[in-house]
Amino acid sequence: MASLRQIAFYGKGGIGKSTTSQNTLAALAEMGQKILIVGCDPKADSTRLILHAKAQDTILSLAASAGSVEDLELEDVMKVGYQDIRCVESGGPEPGVGCAGRGVITSINFLEENGAYENIDYVSYDVLGDVVCGGFAMPIRENKAQEIYIVMSGEMMAMYAANNISKGILKYANSGGVRLGGLICNERQTDKELELAEALAKKLGTQLIYFVPRDNVVQHAELRRMTVLEYAPDSKQADHYRKLAAKVHNNGGKGIIPTPISMDELEDMLMEHGIIKAVDESIIGKTAAELAAS
C-alpha cells in the first residue's frame, strides 16, 4: 500500500467546506482510494452526505454515555458510508462550555490507538477554520495533517480566514511536516472572484487547486443528504469534483510553507482589483446625514 496521505480541509464557517470536502473525498473513493473522514467541527456535519444522516454520533457524546472514551470500541464510533468511506465525528462540548478542540485531541488519540488508520490511503480532517486555536490546530500542531487545503471564496472574510489559517500553518511548518496544499475556491459569484482567488494564492506562495463553480445541484443533493457524486453522477458538477479530486491526488508532496500577508496587504489587493476603493480618511466616523450635509 502507498504511504498514508493525511490531509485536512480548513475554512471559515459557512463557506461550504464540509460539502466540498465530502464531494472531493467521494470522488477520490470512486478512484479506488480508501478513505477515512475525521470530522473536527463541533457541528458534526463532516460526514452527513456520506452517511445520509443528519449528524453522526460523536466520540465525545458516545464517551459521555459509556462513561469514558476507554469504554468505547472502534465499531461504536466508526460508520461506513458511500463508496465504503469510513466516517468518524470528534464532536465538542455544549456551546459556551469548555474547549471545542478537546474533542479533536481525544478523537485522534483514540483512533490511532484502536487501529483506525490501518489499510487506508487517505485520512481527511475536516476542521473549523475561523480561528486556529490550540484545539482546532491539533491536526497541524501534532503533525497529523500533512497537507492543508483551504476552502475559500472571493469574499473578504473568507480570504481573511484563509490568510489566518496560513499563519497557523507557518507557525508549525518548521517544527513538523505540515504544508499548504493549496486553495479551493467555492464560488459565491462575487465580483472578480477567480482573479482574487488566484491573486491570494500567489500572495501566499501557493496554488489555486480548483475553482468550484456554483450550481444548484449541490443544494439539491444536500437536501437529500447525498454528495453530488451519488445524487447526480453524470452532472457537470460531479465532473468538477472529480477534477478537483484528481488535482488533490496528484498533489502529494508538492505542498509549500505559506507566506501570509497583513490585513493592509489584503485590503490593498482588493483595491488593486477594484473591489474596494481607497479609503477617504475624512469620512471615517461620519453618519449618512453628516456626509449629506457636507
Curated annotation (Swiss-Prot):
GO terms for biological process: nitrogen fixation. Its EC number is 1.18.6.1. The modification ADP-ribosylarginine is found at residue 102. [4Fe-4S] cluster binds at residues 99, 133. It comes from the Bacteria. It catalyses: N2 + 8 reduced [2Fe-2S]-[ferredoxin] + 16 ATP + 16 H2O = H2 + 8 oxidized [2Fe-2S]-[ferredoxin] + 2 NH4(+) + 16 ADP + 16 phosphate + 6 H(+). InterPro entries: NifH/chlL_CS, NifH/frxC, Nitrogenase_Fe_NifH, P-loop_NTPase. The keyword Metal-binding applies. Keywords: 4Fe-4S, ADP-ribosylation, ATP-binding, Iron, Iron-sulfur, Metal-binding, Nitrogen fixation, Nucleotide-binding, Oxidoreductase. Binds 1 [4Fe-4S] cluster per dimer. Coiled coil: none annotated. GO terms for molecular function: 4 iron, 4 sulfur cluster binding; ATP binding; metal ion binding; nitrogenase activity. ATP binds at residues 11-18. SUPFAM superfamilies: P-loop containing nucleoside triphosphate hydrolases. The reversible ADP-ribosylation of Arg-102 inactivates the nitrogenase reductase and regulates nitrogenase activity. Its cofactor is [4Fe-4S] cluster. The key enzymatic reactions in nitrogen fixation are catalyzed by the nitrogenase complex, which has 2 components: the iron protein and the molybdenum-iron protein. Homodimer. Belongs to the NifH/BchL/ChlL family. This is Nitrogenase iron protein. It comes from Bradyrhizobium diazoefficiens (strain JCM 10833 / BCRC 13528 / IAM 13628 / NBRC 14792 / USDA 110). The gene is nifH.
